[in-house]
């Protein structure tokens, strides 16, 4: 495995400004939207002809073509008009929720056919065959009003944002970004509890997913895939930042976490989406679309490999997805990455879908990260193969005038709308790396724009820190799936915001206070903090994001540990919470019994020592001396009955 760093764009010093004359819509989206407009124009024209020259039945049909359900009102069935409007709303939800792209046209066509069939039939409260001619101009008025309202909303949002461009560019020219926080915080008891929970979750039977939240798998916060993603990312950060010199146990845990992503319960949702949205019965979760699974898993594996150096998932067939009828779809890190690259190339929009027909910015950022991270750890160039087109799509199809990006866009008709998943349907950056690896200049611009709102808020919170604590009683907030509230979620935002502005004092205070105020005292399968599984994963990510955050880990790739390492011990009996070499010569080690109030006699096997050199292992009432063997290895026996903080160093000559 190789580790490389792409320095492309890293040296740029000029700020990335916003376009002074931004387009209202990108070229590909414009073409898709024009196709929709032509189709609607033909549809309305046919409806108008039927109204003008047709029989009563055809007039009813044509009236519904002008406005869904209006034909029912024309034939004096107002109740069915209301039913149609409700059906249109349901179809709209299904269009977005399960990619039922046919739902709205089907309801529209059904309302027209139904009105025609009832044209000469009985009525509820009026005479048989009654028609209300005034409905025809009302249908046209309704169509014009609806289309006009849509255009007005889009145009007013565009003009409002475009008016900000001169001010924003002036700000960007002089904006300064705070240095990232890179100092490592020593793990405390809550870190130990969180790590213990992660191990307990990972090492349950491989078909076990106890500890996750269960619910629908299409949208919301109960998707198993995203819960697994966040937990694995967090564990990767812990491995890289706190256990680089004791990789054995956490590497096995992370390998198990990746394998759990192949559990059928995690990805079986795709069969229904692919069938409904693509009319494709193939359940393979990697082959086509579904970037919300393939790209996220690719990025997860990147992080695991960068943190631990494992090459397990580079082996052919190391990722096996077994469908309910026994069909097996075999992949590995390389073929998974190739599938993501291939999907980018086949997409006419440049971004490819999560749910069929819907391409989300965040998911496609994750797709770019999946390619970039693979390139770093394997020395390939998959990201550079798609980078230019990908960036063009980002800048010309998704960018809005104020520097934010549309959350979602249709691959079929080019429209973007607010799904309610993110505030306002836009954001300055997204993905776990927020452009830092794939497009550093974009990352700097996004961070500068985010700081305009975040810096004053974080400054006010920072002034409230006393004695290393932030004494706030924050109200619980709804989790993303809206089935429960969490006291931890507001703290995640504060810690993330404090990292954004580079306020280490506020970060430490929020980490300390959040643990004190949100602790439950419970262990797996319950959670040690008041949060959902996704919320817990997000919290661990922001808690463990120094000195390396996820972007830094991706850009660094895997680096062999320097200095002494803890090669092996009784991992089931002892919890190692820290193993780092601050100077390349010594080893700082923290460990405690896996079981509370237990005293365990263990052996610590050390490696990468200097052959024949005398060492001491001391701290927390312990003192051991030994000489490293010719192979640079040594073993020490000791009793662990409490938290021990030890330092292994070369013995000082008397």
Regions found by a protein language model. Name each.
Residues 5-208, 303, 307-311, 425-614, ...:
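Terminal, non-catalytic domain-edge segments
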Residues 292, 321, 327-331, 335, ...:
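Extended ligand-binding clefts on enzyme/binding-domain cores
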Residues 176-279, 499, 503-506:
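Long, contiguous N-terminal structural blocks used for assembly/anchoring
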Residues 236-358:
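Extended ligand-binding groove/face enriched in aromatic
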Residues 199-219, 259-284, 337-358, 395-418, ...:
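Glycine- and aromatic-rich loop/turn segments at beta-sheet edges
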Residues 618-636:
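Solvent-exposed beta-strand/loop surfaces of large extracellular or lumenal domains
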Residues 191-199, 232, 247-265, 294-305, ...:
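Hydrophobic core segments within long, regular secondary-structure runs in both alpha-
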Residues 223-239, 289-305, 359-375, 416-435, ...:
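Well-ordered alpha-helical segments within folded domains of soluble proteins
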């Amino acid at each position: 495995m190789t580790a490389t760093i792409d320095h492309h764009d890293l040296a740029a010093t000029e700020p990335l400004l916003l376009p002074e004359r931004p387009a209202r819509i990108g070229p590909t989206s414009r073409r898709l939207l024009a196709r929709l407009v032509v189709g609607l124009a033909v549809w309305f024209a046919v409806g108008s002809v039927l109204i003008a020259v047709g029989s009563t039945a055809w007039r009813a049909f044509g009236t519904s073509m002008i406005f869904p359900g209006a034909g029912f009102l024309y034939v004096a069935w107002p109740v069915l008009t209301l039913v149609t409007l409700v059906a249109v709303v349901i179809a709209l939800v299904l269009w977005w929720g399960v990619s039922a792209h046919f739902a709205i046209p089907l309801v529209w066509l059904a309302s027209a056919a139904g009105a025609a069939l009832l044209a000469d039939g009985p009525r509820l409260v009026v005479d048989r065959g009654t028609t209300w001619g005034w409905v025809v101009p009302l249908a046209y008025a309704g169509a014009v009003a609806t289309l006009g309202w849509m255009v007005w909303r889009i145009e007013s949002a565009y003009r409002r944002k475009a008016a900000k461009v001169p001010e924003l560019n002036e700000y960007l020219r002089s904006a300064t970004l705070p240095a990232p926080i890179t100092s490592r915080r020593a793990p405390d008891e809550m870190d130990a509890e969180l790590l213990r929970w992660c191990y307990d979750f990972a090492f349950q039977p491989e078909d076990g997913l106890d500890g996750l939240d269960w619910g629908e798998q299409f949208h919301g916060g109960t998707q198993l895939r995203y819960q697994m993603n966040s937990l694995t990312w967090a564990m990767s950060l812990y491995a890289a930042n706190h256990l680089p010199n004791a990789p054995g146990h956490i590497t096995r845990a992370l390998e198990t976490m990746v394998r759990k992503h192949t559990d059928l319960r995690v990805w079986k949702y795709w069969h229904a989406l692919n069938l409904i949205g693509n009319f494709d019965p193939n359940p393979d979760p990697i082959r086509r679309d579904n970037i919300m699974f393939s790209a996220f898993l690719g990025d997860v594996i990147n992080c695991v490999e960068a943190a631990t150096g494992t090459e397990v998932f580079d082996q052919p067939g190391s990722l096996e997805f077994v469908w309910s009828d026994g069909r097996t779809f075999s992949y590995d890190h390389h073929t998974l990455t190739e599938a993501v690259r291939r999907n980018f190339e086949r997409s006419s929009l440049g971004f490819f879908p999560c749910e069929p027909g819907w391409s989300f910015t965040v998911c496609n950022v994750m797709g770019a990260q999946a390619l970039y991270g693979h390139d770093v750890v394997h020395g390939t160039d998959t990201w550079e193969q798609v980078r230019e087109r990908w960036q063009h799509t980002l800048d010309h199809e998704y960018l809005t005038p104020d520097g934010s990006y549309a959350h979602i866009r249709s691959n079929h008709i080019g429209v973007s709308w607010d799904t309610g998943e993110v505030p306002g349907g836009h954001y300055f950056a997204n993905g776990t790396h927020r452009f830092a690896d794939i497009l550093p200049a974009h990352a700097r611009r996004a961070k500068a724009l985010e700081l305009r709102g975040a810096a004053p808020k974080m400054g006010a919170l920072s002034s409230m820190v006393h004695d290393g604590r932030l004494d706030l009683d924050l109200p619980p907030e709804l989790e993303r799936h809206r089935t429960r509230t969490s006291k931890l979620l507001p703290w995640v935002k504060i810690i993330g915001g404090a990292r954004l502005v580079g306020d280490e004092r506020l970060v430490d205070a929020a980490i300390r206070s959040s643990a004190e105020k949100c602790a439950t005292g419970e262990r797996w399968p319950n959670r040690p903090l008041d949060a959902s599984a996704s919320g817990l994963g997000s919290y661990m990510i922001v808690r463990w994001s120094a000195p390396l955050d996820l972007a830094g880990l991706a850009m660094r790739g895997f680096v062999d540990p320097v200095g002494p390492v803890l090669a092996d011990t009784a991992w089931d009996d002892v919890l190692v919470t820290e193993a780092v070499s601050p100077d390349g010569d010594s080893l700082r080690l923290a460990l405690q019994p896996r079981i509370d109030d237990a005293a365990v006699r263990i052996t610590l096997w050390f490696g990468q020592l200097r052959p024949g050199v005398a060492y001491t292992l001391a701290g927390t009432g312990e003192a051991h001396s030994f000489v490293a063997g010719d192979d640079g290895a040594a073993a020490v026996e000791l009793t662990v009955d409490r938290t021990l903080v030890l330092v292994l160093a070369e013995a000082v000559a008397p």
